[in-house]
Amino acid sequence: MSQHVMFNAVLSSHPALFIQGEWRIGNGVSFEKQDPMSQQRLWQARAADHTDVTLACHAARAAFPAWARASLEQRATVIQQFAALLEQHKQSLARTISLETSKPYWETLTEVQAMIGKVAISLQAYQTRTGHSQTPMGDSMSVLRHRPHGVLAVFGPYNFPGHLPNGHIVPALLAGNTVVFKPSELTPWTAEETVKLWQEAGIPDGVLNLVQGGRETGEALAAQPDIDGLLFTGSAHTGYHLHRQLAGQPEKMLALEMGGNNALIVEQVKDRDAVVNLAIQSAFISAGQRCTCSRRLLVKTGAEGDAFLLRFTAVAQALRIGRWDEQPAPFMGAVISSQAAERMLAAQQHLLLLGGESLLNMTRPDSQSALLTPGIIDITNISEVPDEEYFGPLVSVIRYTDFTEALKIANQTRFGLAVGLVSEDRQQFEQLLLEARAGIVNWNKPLTGASSAAPFGGVGASGNHRPSAFYAADYCAWPMASLECEHLTLPATLSPGISFDLPKV
């Protein structure tokens, strides 16, 4: 796999779309990706316009019958070859992800490893969630099968540009769907390099297509009559827009995995540094750019809570931040873009103007970089707290008096992705399980910890239940129920009102 650390301007028309098994130059506007740390151009190409998107969808539609009729073993062979190529190019792809996202190299290596692991998990999920089963019913058989939707559009996010779209593409292809993949315009290079591996793995022409671009490309794809469903991972704002765009089209499957305004409740625990480490991992890993990051840190009032916050603030202030390949390795890098950095600083200023108290001021050490330092704001005294997902290294502290109040505060959000509890009291966790309105409920584990072998997703503004991880299989195939009998015979007992005691013709 090539490593184009920086494209020259003459490569603005390099073929970055993959349609019908061919790399093509887009007909849309030229756009580029900059290194979040240095602002140097990493990648540049032309976006897909409406014509390109239509062509990609037509290619996927034409390829669908043969791919759907191929055996599961045939489809799995291609997907397993893709996994083998990921293993072979793990370091190269991890470097590409690090360059585009600014995530440290140690973190992007784990992302590529998760992409590899997704193949085996998807095979298991396909059999468990959407396989073939039959139940005897007297002289017949009740049979359950699953069938692919057809053409699925996959919209990928920028925070995990390899792992998260991979979590939809792999199960979609395994189930027999064909795919049109639209990655985030902030991570086009990772998508391009990943699709090259699919091509090398032998994916048939038209089965997987790549369209690059921003909002216009996404809207064109969502509006295509040739798609049968759409799998989306990203912000609630964009997810709501897609939901409105597909309104009135119940024939199209729409799966939305969006963000969260997640709460981490901190009760008393003996090992204070263990709690601080968990809170740091929950709030600031990936520079706070995970949908499960804790945006709200609920800390009990009193001396123990005060001591925890002092230690938490000190450790956050001392976190090593920097370029993805620096040594010693940083804990976190920059946010995805200068615009994202500006939005985070504006969010901090807004909370301070509302009456928040800064415990640790988030700063931008270099105006020419998207690198931010961690920020902590006590918003306990704000009367009307904005219910927003601030997607970056900024966490809000809310003090509470008792556990009942903490539960109430945790549920005061339109989102419902994740909530966590740090406590040595099992009964408190049992109460949280009963009252939490969230798809992920963790106990003494970071909010950002999740298993690909479990469902992933949330309720409310966090999405329509579990379209990611193990349950992604559910959204990639529809159930077909059959009653089957090999030999038709007249029943021994007829329904009332029916008689065959008639002269035969």
From Swiss-Prot:
It comes from the Bacteria. One of its GO terms (biological process) is arginine catabolic process to succinate. SUPFAM superfamilies: ALDH-like. InterPro entries: Ald_DH/histidinol_DH (IPR016161), Ald_DH_C (IPR016163), Ald_DH_CS_CYS (IPR016160), Ald_DH_CS_GLU (IPR029510), Ald_DH_N (IPR016162), Aldehyde_DH_dom (IPR015590), SuccinylGlu_semiald_DH_AstD (IPR017649). The active site is at E257, C291. Its EC number is 1.2.1.71. GO terms for molecular function: succinylglutamate-semialdehyde dehydrogenase activity. The keyword NAD applies. Pathway: Amino-acid degradation; L-arginine degradation via AST pathway; L-glutamate and succinate from L-arginine: step 4/5. CDD domains: ALDH_SGSD_AstD. Keywords: Arginine metabolism, NAD, Oxidoreductase. NAD(+) binds at G234, S235, A236, H237, T238, G239. It catalyses: N-succinyl-L-glutamate 5-semialdehyde + NAD(+) + H2O = N-succinyl-L-glutamate + NADH + 2 H(+). The keyword DNA-binding does not apply. PANTHER family: ALDEHYDE DEHYDROGENASE-RELATED. NCBIfam families: arg_catab_astD, PRK09457.1. Catalyzes the NAD-dependent reduction of succinylglutamate semialdehyde into succinylglutamate. Belongs to the aldehyde dehydrogenase family. AstD subfamily. This is N-succinylglutamate 5-semialdehyde dehydrogenase.
